[in-house]
Amino acid sequence: MKKVMFVCKRNSCRSQMAEGFAKTLGAGKIAVTSCGLESSRVHPTAIAMMEEVGIDISGQTSDPIENFNADDYDVVISLCGCGVNLPPEWVTQEIFEDWQLEDPDGQSLEVFRTVRGQVKERVENLIAKIS
């Protein structure tokens, strides 16, 4: 079973939604974690957006990348274009992708929904590719 790490700047919105989708859609196929270059909180609007599609991410936590070891993961996905800021060991794993999705923080609910849809589609494609 492949181990996947989703990373974004604050581990608040995009990476949290990706973790929620991956845990739900990839249950039994992949192991999933998320982190940020810095930690903050799981954004309340991200929680609400995922509730709209029947996924509860309210129990997820926002954790800094320093809490994890890159060698524990086969797949590393940056969601925010922050790949250039990751320590080198994170971008040299078996699979590294930088999805460069828009940050919905502070934007309309429609932007959140659009980003949520983009995250879901990419997570589905990732699961199909690695499982």
Curated annotation (Swiss-Prot):
Effect of C35A: Little or no effect on arsenate reductase activity
Active site: C8 (nucleophile), C80 (nucleophile)
GO MF entry, a single one: arsenate reductase (glutaredoxin) activity
Reactions it catalyzes: O-phospho-L-tyrosyl-[protein] + H2O = L-tyrosyl-[protein] + phosphate; [glutaredoxin]-dithiol + arsenate + glutathione + H(+) = glutathionyl-S-S-[glutaredoxin] + arsenite + H2O
GO biological process: response to arsenic-containing substance
CDD domains listed in its UniProt record: LMWP_ArsC
EC number(s) per entry: 1.20.4.1, 3.1.3.48
Outcome of substituting C13S: Little or no effect on arsenate reductase activity. Abolishes protein phosphatase activity
Top-level taxon: Bacteria
Gene3D superfamilies to which the protein is assigned, alphabetical: 3.40.50.2300
Disulfide bonds: C8-C80, C80-C82
Keywords carried by this UniProt record: Arsenical resistance, Disulfide bond, Hydrolase, Oxidoreductase, Redox-active center
Miscellaneous section: Cys-8 probably provides the initial functional group for covalent attachment of the electron-accepting substrate, arsenate, to ArsC.
Quaternary assembly: Homodimer.
Family designation: Belongs to the low molecular weight phosphotyrosine protein phosphatase family.
Biological role stated in the UniProt entry: Reduces arsenate [As(V)] to arsenite [As(III)] using glutathione and glutaredoxin as sources of reducing equivalents. GrxA is the most effective electron donor in vivo compared to other glutaredoxins. Constitutes the major arsenate reductase compared to ArsI1 and ArsI2. Also shows weak phosphatase activity toward p-nitrophenyl phosphate.
Protein name: Glutaredoxin arsenate reductase
